[in-house]
Amino acid sequence: MFDSIVIPFGAKALYNTIKLKPGVTIDDVELAMGEMCNVVKNNYGGDKGGFIAGQVLKFSGFVSDEGSLGPSRGADHDLAIVTYWRSFAEHERSHADAQFHAKFSVLAEMCADSKELGYEILWQGNAE
């Protein structure tokens, strides 16, 4: 669950930002997110459906002055889920599944907004 991940070049990255409803905390959504992520990992991992790896991120409030251009120093979301897939089509098939929908709907009840945007990896590397 907390192991390093390896992302092959050419994988599709889906970046899902989540804004929680007022009064909802990270602790409130932790179980729902864990169950949803387990459905994806267990049912669609590797040859079963193209899921490669994923990460759940919490915005922690620190902002890089060196890497930021505009005046905004905040985020419009609380959490991000980054998943990596062999293809966008495999991602969409997994998320159309009834079992995934059941788990996602529990999380959605606690969210004010969620956007899932797709990216292609242009560069990646490790420290030498």
Where are the regions a protein language model picked out?
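Short S/T/G/P-rich N-terminal loop/turn motif that feeds into the first structured element of a domain
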Residues: 1-101, 112-128
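Short, composition-biased linear "edge" segments at structural boundaries
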Residues: 107-108
